[in-house]
Amino acid sequence: MGRFIFVSFGLLVVFLSLSGTGAALNCASGWSGYDQHCYKVFDKPKSWADAEKFCKNSTNGSHLASIHSSEEEAFVVKLVSQTLESQILWMGLSKVWNQCDWGWSNGAKLKYKAWAEESYCVYFSSTKKGWRSRACRLLGHFVCKSPA
């Protein structure tokens, strides 16, 4: 009876240690799983657009990571901290300023536009809380996310 409990406990420990790493999900080698998605940290800095393109080409359905809960963010931050030290990491959120619905404070419609050719993309840090934005053309590490 003691041996049965020991073996059962051992199997439970193995199962729990593998859950959340992609073993229970159908993630490619080197990718980690969480909540029906697979994630991978890439340590070669790229612009936001190049990182998104890289993610799209790396595996079917992959994009820069989108974060939908504090638990998912904690998972990604932990994954990043295992791979990189304090780094700026692109996520899949961006705002192209010249494509927004803008209006003047006096209520007049915006007809004339003279936007600079700059867009802003969102990044996070593995050591600082909160999301920040910066020019998309700047280089940063990134995390890709794909359906499991």
From Swiss-Prot:
The protein's superkingdom reads Eukaryota
Entry keyword annotation includes Signal: yes
Q: Which GO terms describe its molecular function?
A: toxin activity
UniProt name for this protein: Snaclec B9
| Species name | Macrovipera lebetinus (Levantine viper)
Q: What else is known?
A: Shows greater sequence similarity to the beta than alpha subunits compared to other heterodimer snaclecs.
Against InterPro entries, the record matches this protein to:
C-type_lectin-like (IPR001304), C-type_lectin-like/link_sf (IPR016186), C-type_lectin/snaclec_domain (IPR050111), C-type_lectin_CS (IPR018378), CTDL_fold (IPR016187)
Q: Where is the C-type lectin domain?
A: 34-145
